């Protein structure tokens, strides 16, 4: 659960950073290579899990949020990550859990 929260947060940050770079006219592969060689380098950027439809992302974030509520722990980034993941899915035409029947 902790690993997945951090993974989806990295994927969300990668998506937003690469999207901004694209709008600035930066070549995506050159940007990715530069980021991998910087403090922004991370496993998700290297292995590109964002190229799959991320079927478990929202479920994972719902679990984290529920457990955090139960434990009375504030995890505000988790809610933001859940929304960014939805944005990525919408932008790429990937189904949400509801659309998949889950």
Labelled PLM ranges:
Residues 1-102:
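Helical "substrate-binding/catalytic lid" subdomain
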């Amino acid at each position: 659960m902790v690993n997945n929260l951090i993974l989806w947060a990295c994927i969300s940050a990668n998506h937003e950073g690469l999207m901004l770079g694209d709008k600035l006219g930066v070549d995506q592969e050159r940007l990715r290579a530069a980021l991998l060689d910087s403090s922004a380098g991370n496993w998700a950027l290297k292995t590109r899990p964002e190229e799959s439809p991320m079927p478990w992302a929202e479920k994972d974030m719902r679990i984290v949020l529920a457990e955090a509520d139960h434990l009375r722990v504030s995890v505000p980034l988790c809610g933001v990550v859940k929304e960014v993941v939805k944005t990525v899915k919408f932008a790429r035409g990937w189904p949400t859990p509801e659309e998949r029947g889950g």
